Amino acid sequence: MGKRNKKVTQGKRAYNDKSEIVLENKQFEGYYKKQNLFRGKPNDEFDSFMEYMRKPLPTTFRICGYRHHAFELKNHFEKYYVPSLKNVVHEGQTIPPPTVLPWYPDGLAYIVDAQKDVIRKSPPLKRLQRFLVSENEAGNINRQEAVSMLPPLFLDVEPHHVILDMCAAPGSKTAQLIEAVYKKANIKDAAHDSKNLKSVEGLVIANDADPKRAQMLVHQINRLNSPNILVVNHDASTMPNIYVKGSSPSDGLNVIEEKKILKFDRILADVPCSGDGTFRKNLSLWREWSANSAFSLHPLQLRILIRGLQLLKVGGCLVYSTCSINPIENEAVVTAALKATGGAVSLVDVSKKLPLLKRDPGLLSWKVLDDSLNEFQSPAENTNDKIELTESMWPLPEEEMSKLHIERCARLYPHMQNTGGFFVAVLQKTDPINSRSFDPKKYTASMEILPPENKRQRTEKGVDEASNSTLTKSGNSYFDEEPFVYINPDDTSIKTIVDFYGIDPSFPRDQFFVRNQSGIPVRSIYFACSLFKEIIEANTNRVKFVHGGVRFFVKQEISQLLKDFSLKANKDICNFRIHSNGVNIISPFLNEKHFYDAGLKDLKILVKNEYPHVEQFSESGMLKKEFEKMPLGCNILRVDAQTKDGALMDMLILQPIWRSPTSCNLMLARKEKQNLSLELFGMDV
C-alpha cells in the first residue's frame, strides 16, 4: 500500500491535526453493506464495524522473542512501566495501562489503547515513549500494528527454510520472519549464541519493487545484525529466478558445474492493496476511498500471487495477505490463483492456529460494484473506459467455491479485537504448476504464459550459460548498487585479522566480503551465511542485490603516537577493529586474551565520555585493574549487568573498546550509546 502523508483530525474535527476530515463516507458504507460482510450475524454487527473504523488505532508492539533477554525485558516492562501507566488521563480521557495481546505467542506483544501522537505528546506517557523509541532502535522491540504480526505467525518457519518476502518494505514482517527462524533453532540471539548459527541453514530474501522502499528495509535489518538476510529490488510480479549450485555430474574427465533454480520453502506475499482496512490510521482514506481502486490492483495482486506460487517448493507454504477488506483484492485473487494452478495448490485450514485470535471465514460470494455502486454480472457489462474488469473478479459457482474451501481464508475486522482490518490466506503447493494451463485473457491481460516448471528448470541452464560469458566476477556491476565481492581467505588483510584476534579455524573465513568493485578491503568487511554467498556468486548481474550481511571489521586509522607506543611495547596493533554490529557473532571464535571485564560504573563512564582518561575510572573498579594488561588497539569489553548492581535488567554486554596509551573509548555511535544507556540505566547519562 502506498504511503499516505496527509494529516487530518477526528470527529467532525479530526484527532491528530488541524485540517478537517469528516469520518464518514456513504459510498464506503453502501459498498460494504451490499457485500453483506457479516452474513448470519446480528444486524448491529455492521454498526459495530463502522464504529471502530472511526476510532483511533491503538499502539502495539512486540518484544523480539529470540533475543537472549526477551523475557527479562518483558518482566522489566511489566514491573517498571505498566504500574506507572495506571490512571493516566489525557485531555479528559482515561488511557488504560498496556495489556498483553492475548493471541500472540508467549505473551510478548502489547497493546496501548492510545495512538502514537498521544503517547508522544502526553507528559505521563513520556517515559513509555522513551522506552519504545530506545528499545525499537536497539532491535529489542518492534512497533508494529497488531494484525501486521499475523502473516509470519501463519508461515511456521523452520531454521533450514529459505524464505521469500515478496513485498517486504518497511520490513517489520521481514524482521519477524528471521526472529522466528532463530527462535525455532533455539538461538536466543544471533548476537549471543553465534556458535549455534551453524544450525540455521536458511535465509530470508526480502524484496521490494520500489528502490527507496527497499532501502527502508536496510534499517530494520541492521538492527537485527543477522547474517541470514538478503535484500533485493525487483517487481514482485516478475521476480527473476534465483540460481544456486546444482548437482555436478562428471563426464569422466571434467566436473560440469550446473545451476538450479532456487525454490522457496516459505513465501510471504503481503501485496500492495487499497488499504481500506487502515482507515483508523490513514484518515485521508475517508475522503479518498474508491471502489474502483480494487479493479486496478486485482491484476497486479494476482500476478504477484501466481509468481509466488511458481517460486514455491512443492510442499511449501505461501501466505497471501492484504490490509484491505475488499473481496476483489482478497477472495477473488485467491480463487483465481487456485483455479489457474489447476489443483496444484490448496488452501490450508488455520482455524485452530492462534486459538485466541478472533476471525471470520472467507466470503464465498460477493458483488462486483463500481464507485456508483452499480453491479456488474460480467466483464461484458462494463461500459466505463476508466475501469477494466476481468472474469477473475467474480466468485465461481457456489459448489466450486466450496470445493476450493475459500472459507479457510481469514478475515479480521476492527471491532473484533480493536485492530485494523486484515485478510490472510495460507496456501500449500502439493504439485508442480503446469503454467501452460494459464489463460491470460481469462485472468488478466498482462499475465505472461510460462512453460511448465519442469521444462523451465531444464531450459534455463542454457540461457544462464550464454549470459554468463559477458559477466564479471563481481556481483551486481550491472546495477547501481555497490557489488558484493568475496575476499580470498588468503588475502593479507584477512590473514592479519585472523592472526591478531586468534579467530578459531572452525569459523568460515571464506564468507567475508566487501562492497566495492576492486574486492580489496579498504574500509569495511562484512560476513553472511553460506547460502547468501552461493546466491551472490551464482546470480551476477541478474538479480539486483541491495543489502545484506553484518559488518564485522572496520579499518581504523592508527595515530603516530599509538604506533610509537606499540613499537616501544614490541606489540602489534591490528588496523582493523571489530565493529559493534558483528562483535557478538564473532566473539565465541576469538582468543580469550581480547576480552576484558568491567563493571556498570565503568560502563557508565565510557557511555558518558569520549576517550575517558584512565584516571577517571575508580581504583576499585575492574576496568582500571585490567587497563594495564589490555593491549593497545581494539579489545572487547565484557560487562555482566545485574539488577542487584543497579542495572534495570540482567544482561551480558559485549562491545568493542579501543585502548590508547592513557585512555580508552567505547566504539559505539552516539545513538547506540544513548540506547544502551536507556536500556541499562533508564536515562541518557
Swiss-Prot record:
Lineage: superkingdom: Eukaryota
GO biological process assignments: tRNA methylation; tRNA wobble base cytosine methylation
Positions contributing to S-adenosyl-L-methionine binding: 167-173, 208, 235, 270
CDD domains assigned to the protein according to its UniProt record, in alphabetical order: AdoMet_MTases
Enzyme class: transferase
GO-annotated cellular components: cytoplasm; nucleus
Phenotype upon gene inactivation: Cells lacking both trm4a and trm4b show a mild resistance to calcium chloride.
Subcellular location: Nucleus
E.C. number(s) listed in UniProt: 2.1.1.-
Catalytic activity annotation: cytidine(49) in tRNA precursor + S-adenosyl-L-methionine = 5-methylcytidine(49) in tRNA precursor + S-adenosyl-L-homocysteine + H(+); cytidine(50) in tRNA + S-adenosyl-L-methionine = 5-methylcytidine(50) in tRNA + S-adenosyl-L-homocysteine + H(+); cytidine(60) in tRNA(Asp) + S-adenosyl-L-methionine = 5-methylcytidine(60) in tRNA(Asp) + S-adenosyl-L-homocysteine + H(+); cytidine(61) in tRNA(Asp) + S-adenosyl-L-methionine = 5-methylcytidine(61) in tRNA(Asp) + S-adenosyl-L-homocysteine + H(+)
Record keywords: Methyltransferase, Nucleus, RNA-binding, S-adenosyl-L-methionine, Transferase, tRNA processing, tRNA-binding
Name of one Pfam family that matches: PUA_NSUN2
Cystine connections: none
InterPro entries in UniProt: MeTrfase_RsmB-F_NOP2_cat, MeTrfase_RsmB-F_NOP2_dom, RCMT, RCMT_NCL1, RsmB/NOL1/NOP2-like_CS, SAM-dependent_MTases_sf
Enzyme active site: 323
GO MF, one annotated term: tRNA binding
Keyword Methyltransferase tagged: yes
Gene3D superfamilies from the UniProt entry: Vaccinia Virus protein VP39
Record PANTHER family: NCL1 YEAST -RELATED NOL1/NOP2/FMU SUN DOMAIN-CONTAINING, RNA CYTOSINE-C(5)-METHYLTRANSFERASE NSUN2-RELATED
Known function: tRNA cytosine C(5)-methyltransferase that methylates cytosine to 5-methylcytosine (m5C) in tRNAs at position 49 and 50. Trm4a and trm4b methylate different sets of tRNAs. Also methylates cytosine to m5C at positions (60, 61 and 62) in tRNA(Asp).
Family to which the UniProt record says this protein belongs: Belongs to the class I-like SAM-binding methyltransferase superfamily. RsmB/NOP family. TRM4 subfamily.
Protein name as annotated: Multisite-specific tRNA:(cytosine-C(5))-methyltransferase trm4b
The organism of origin for this protein: Schizosaccharomyces pombe (strain 972 / ATCC 24843)
Gene name tied to this protein: trm4b
